[in-house]
A protein has these predicted regions:
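Conserved catalytic-core segment of NTP-binding enzymes
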Residues: 113-215, 220-221
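Cytosolic-facing regulatory segments adjacent to core modules
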Residues: 72, 81-82, 88-136
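Walker A/P-loop phosphate-binding motif and the immediately C-terminal alpha-helix
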Residues: 2-42
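Short, well-ordered alpha-helices that flank and scaffold nucleotide-derived cofactor binding pockets
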Residues: 25, 29, 48, 147, ...
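C-terminal boundary of histidine-terminating zinc-finger modules
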Residues: 223-239
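P-loop NTP-binding site
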Residues: 204, 208, 218, 239-265
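Phosphate-binding loop that captures ATP/GTP phosphates
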Residues: 33-34, 42-91
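Conserved Rossmann-like nucleotide-cofactor binding loop
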Residues: 42, 97, 161
Length: 265
């Protein structure tokens, strides 16, 4: 059984790539096999956090979209690269070449692409979780990612613009029959201490808040140089996110569906 999850936010810079990368290694630490996909094709960044160089990425999602390589060519097993003792993490990166980014913006890709990738990862790599790291906002790519996923993890800050946008995003996801769970990120430390915060915010945005991650100076200072919780396993950020990983496992154990897909890419 494979669960597909899209990590998304209405606005940019909410911590999607940071959360995706840290969540992947925490799920692996819990014995899970995880694949993360950088679907922020117009501004990829996940490879930076994973310390995956362009030499390591012989082929990218862009090459696969245009039939220049096989599926196996774009799947990078980074379990050993990250020195993970348990589970597995696979990474599928996007091209950083300007001409490739322009091409995919101009030409787009098939609406079956997300489901095709998830199916391949499920069947050929036996992964438990497929996590799509997306571009922010309510664009076409996002809606495709949402429609192709079992659950959406929406990240938001305690900012009025994020609150309004997250509410709208959740409502749209509901219209597609998709469940969204919300993680509050970069929460000011004084607010994060309030035990009523998750229930209060859940009511306002009409979606379930499953975790709170305070703003930590150390994460900002880390400057995306590696996966934070591998460098700082004892840091409160790592333990808070571990709770979210466990919660996600609980929630998806009951709600995930078997992927039944037949489409071509
Ligand atoms: N809880 C946090 N506390 C402090 N800084 C954070 C936190 N989460 C993420 N960041 C920082 O915020 C910036 C944006 O994060 P990123 O994951 O790149 O966002 P996105 O992928 O949504 O654009 C990065 O510099 C990251 O280190
Ligand atoms: Mg990002």
């Amino acid at each position: 059984m494979t669960t597909t999850c899209v990590v998304h936010s209405y606005r940019g810079g909410t911590g999607k790539s940071t959360t995706t990368s840290n969540l992947s290694v925490l799920l692996a630490a819990l014995g899970k096999r995880v694949a993360t996909i950088d679907m922020d094709i117009t501004s990829p960044g996940l490879h930076v956090i994973y310390n995956v160089s362009s030499q390591m990425m012989n082929f990218t999602l862009n090459d696969y979209i245009y039939n220049r390589c096989s599926f196996q060519d774009i799947v990078l097993d980074i379990t050993n690269h990250l020195k993970l003792p348990r589970g597995a993490v696979y990474f599928l990166g996007s091209s950083m070449k300007p001409e490739e980014i322009v091409k995919v913006i101009r030409e787009g890709y098939s609406d079956k692409f997300f489901r095709h990738v998830a199916e391949k990862l499920s069947q050929e790599y036996n992964v438990d979780y497929v996590i799509f790291d997306t571009h922010p906002g309510l664009n076409e790519d996002t809606l495709l990612a949402v429609m192709s996923s079992d659950v959406s993890l929406l990240l938001m800050r305690m900012d009025k613009q994020d609150v309004t946008g997250t509410y709208i995003t959740g409502q749209i996801m509901k219209k597609f029959g998709r469940i969204s769970y919300v993680v509050l990120n970069m929460v000011p430390p004084n607010l994060a201490e309030s035990p009523d915060l998750p229930s209060e915010v859940s009511k306002i945005i009409d979606a379930s808040v499953i975790g709170i991650l305070p703003f930590y100076e150390e994460i900002l200072s880390h400057r995306s140089r590696g996966v934070f919780c591998l460098h700082h396993p004892q840091h409160p950020y790592s333990s808070q996110l571990l709770k979210i990983a466990k919660r996600l496992i609980e929630l998806t154990a009951t709600e995930s569906q078997t992927i039944d897909l037949t489409g071509a890419k």
